[in-house]
């Protein structure tokens, strides 16, 4: 039996800055607003947490449940709406050596910097019992060169292709998600070829095949072990054939007029969803909530989800425990519980945050999850399959986010008509300047 899921509260912090100041919320009872590190108080263990966006632990009621099951524990969670604001404060506290919470959230874009420069400030989970259930590539993202595991995975962002069934029908293309997936199985070039067919045969006004070519570029790059950096931390984007192949294919799509030129999460993209301006968008699991919200009730059942040509990941976070926490052992126990397969499956059903635990992916309460908005697509199975396809090791870099954004801007130049070689040169100059 399938289980429908609603995505109304899914976290977008890893892709878009949510508005909001720091808000102090307690798992139970009322906080005094001054908590930093926890400790022992009134016979109870107080554990403090610093998080961002909607990581799901407070919103799903898991913190309250843990307190009920462990009456000697009190959890005080401070949540920032904006991850950038949160991380800036975390860096300040790390440099000062005070003001840290016992548990700190770590966004994937910060993982490399944490493992390279802050390993001494975070506890090692490598020997913690019951933490061997994560997807290998997820665990590798937060592991130091000498094998320390500085956090445990919360969610992940495996990618698929979201598409408009009604538009595919008007282009004479299959609409069944399995048949659609077969159109481009194994090769992103096939995805672009389908776009050429769509543009040629679509009947029903002006509709672009894809929202922007940068989504295609990101999906191609994120599906490989090495992207912008090598294992030594050296920049290789200009030498990595994967990056250049992705650039050229994205440029081919732009030159063919397949793009609506609407960059994801930039002005114009939301109206594009509402107005049905494009037929496909490369979508990580967490993006479904945004699409359903912005495309609106009028488009429910018109969208569907198909397997992407290759597995890739965009997004995800971790929970780490600070090394000098006065309740380090208790905090590690809480993190292990919050990120266990059962709790990851629960948050997925409640909020849509996709599990990073390979054991969770095998659970029926994940595999059987469907999305009513996306034509009852079996999203648990689709995104689970994508997560398993991702290479076991992914090499992250300290400036991955900056480089990704710069490539997005460079491809926008191509969409606007600039020659790809000139746009590449401009992009490379901007990257070199940004990363030093």
Describe the predicted segments one by one:
Residues 79-89, 108, 183-190, 261-275:
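Short helix-initiation/N-cap motifs at beta->coil->alpha
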Residues 2-111, 130, 175, 326-330, ...:
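Conserved N-terminal structural module of periplasmic/extracytoplasmic solute-binding proteins
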Residues 124-134, 178-185, 206, 226-245, ...:
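Short, solvent-exposed loop/beta-turn-alpha elements that line the ligand-binding surface or hinge
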Residues 107-160, 302-304:
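Hinge/lid segment of periplasmic solute-binding proteins
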Residues 374-431:
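C-terminal capping/gating helix-and-loop segments adjacent to ligand/active sites or protein-protein/ligand interfaces
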Residues 102-105, 279-284:
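Paired acidic/hydrophobic, glycine-rich loop segments that form the ligand-binding mouth/hinge
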Residues 192-196, 232-263:
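Glycine-centered hinge/linker elements that transmit conformational signals in sensory
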Residues 294-356:
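Extracytoplasmic/periplasmic substrate-recognition and gating elements
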């Amino acid at each position: 039996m399938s289980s429908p899921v609603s995505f109304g509260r899914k976290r977008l912090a890893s892709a878009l800055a949510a508005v909001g100041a720091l808000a102090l919320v307690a798992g139970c009872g009322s906080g005094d607003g001054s908590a930093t590190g926890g400790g022992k108080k009134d016979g109870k263990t107080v554990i403090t947490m610093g998080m961002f966006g909607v990581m799901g632990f407070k919103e799903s009621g898991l913190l309250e449940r843990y307190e009920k099951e462990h009456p000697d524990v009190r959890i005080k969670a401070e949540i920032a709406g904006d991850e950038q604001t949160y991380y800036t404060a975390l860096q300040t506290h790390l440099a000062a050596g005070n003001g840290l919470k016992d548990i700190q959230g770590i966004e994937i874009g910060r993982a490399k910097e944490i493992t390279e420069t802050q390993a001494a400030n975070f506890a090692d989970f490598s020997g913690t019992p019951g933490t061997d259930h994560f997807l290998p590539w997820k665990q590798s993202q937060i592991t130091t060169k000498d094998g320390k595991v500085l956090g445990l995975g919360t969610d992940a962002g495996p990618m698929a292709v979201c598409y408009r069934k009604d538009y595919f029908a008007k282009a004479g293309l299959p609409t069944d998600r399995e048949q659609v997936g077969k159109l481009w199985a194994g090769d992103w070039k096939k995805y672009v070829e389908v776009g050429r067919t769509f543009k040629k045969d679509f009947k029903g006004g002006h509709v672009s095949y894809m929202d922007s070519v940068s989504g295609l570029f990101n999906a191609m790059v994120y599906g490989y072990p090495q992207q912008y950096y090598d294992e030594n931390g050296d920049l290789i984007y200009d030498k990595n054939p994967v990056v250049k192949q992705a650039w050229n294919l994205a440029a081919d799509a732009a030159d063919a007029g397949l793009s609506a030129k609407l960059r994801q999460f930039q002005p114009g993209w939301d109206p594009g969803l509402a107005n049905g301006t494009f037929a496909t968008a490369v979508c990580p699991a967490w993006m479904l909530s945004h699409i359903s919200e912005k495309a609106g009730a009028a488009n429910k059942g018109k969208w569907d989800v198909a397997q992407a040509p290759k597995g890739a990941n965009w997004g995800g976070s971790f929970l780490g425990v600070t090394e000098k926490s006065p309740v380090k052992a208790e905090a590690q126990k809480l993190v292990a519980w919050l990120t266990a397969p059962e709790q990851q499956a629960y948050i997925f059903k409640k909020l849509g945050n996709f599990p990073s635990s390979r054991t969770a992916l095998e659970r029926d309460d994940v595999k059987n999850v469907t999305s009513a908005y996306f034509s009852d697509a079996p999203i648990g199975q689709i995104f689970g399959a994508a997560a398993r396809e991702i290479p076991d090791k992914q090499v992250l870099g300290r400036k991955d986010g900056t480089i990704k954004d710069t490539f997005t801007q460079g491809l926008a130049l191509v969409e606007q008509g600039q020659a790809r070689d000139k746009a590449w040169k401009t992009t490379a100059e901007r990257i070199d300047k940004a990363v030093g």
